[in-house]
Regions:
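Histidine-centered catalytic micro-motifs
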Residues: 4-13, 43
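Active-site mouth loops of central-metabolism enzymes
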Residues: 9-22, 138-141
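Flexible loop/turn segments at secondary-structure boundaries
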Residues: 12-14, 45-48, 97
Length: 146
């Protein structure tokens, strides 16, 4: 079975994103496009994490699926050719802006987490460094190596 993945997503809690982004619409769009694995995006944002916890169920190790009652409604009216399984992997993009050796540095890192518990631990650690609730894509003064 071929795997087609989009692993760099954001939630509606990130700047310059659709206010309509939710897990049922992501699930439906993935089916329409033949995508089998989607990143959740913005796992460190507290409001989005609540939606992750209420919208997704564990599937295979490190992957999640849309809850059946949400999936049924999201799939309504799709052509039969759009069938298949969609999985989600817990993911966040961290924007790092910092100085090193007297020079300004900017980079973005995609972080993938294997479980809700790992995501909570990661979020708790980052919360000591910056404000995670202000944007789904946290901007931290942190060297990527740290």
């Amino acid at each position: 079975m071929p795997l087609i993945a989009d692993l760099h997503l954001h939630s509606r809690f990130s700047r310059a994103t659709s206010r309509d982004l939710d897990f049922p619409s992501l699930h439906r769009a993935a089916l329409e496009k033949g995508i089998t694995i989607l990143g959740t995006g913005d796992v460190t944002h507290p409001e989005w994490m609540k939606e992750i916890e209420t919208s997704l169920d564990p599937a295979e190790e490190g992957l999640f699926r849309l809850r059946p009652e949400l999936a049924g409604a999201a799939e309504e009216g799709l052509p039969g050719a759009c069938g298949g399984e969609v999985r989600f992997v817990l993911q966040v993009e961290i924007s790092n802006i910092y100085k090193k050796d007297g020079k300004g540095r900017k980079n973005h890192n995609l972080v993938f987490l294997p479980s809700l518990e790992a995501a909570r631990r990661f979020t708790d650690r980052l919360a000591t460094i910056g404000n995670l609730a202000s944007d789904g894509r946290p901007i931290l003064g942190l060297d990527a190596r740290d």
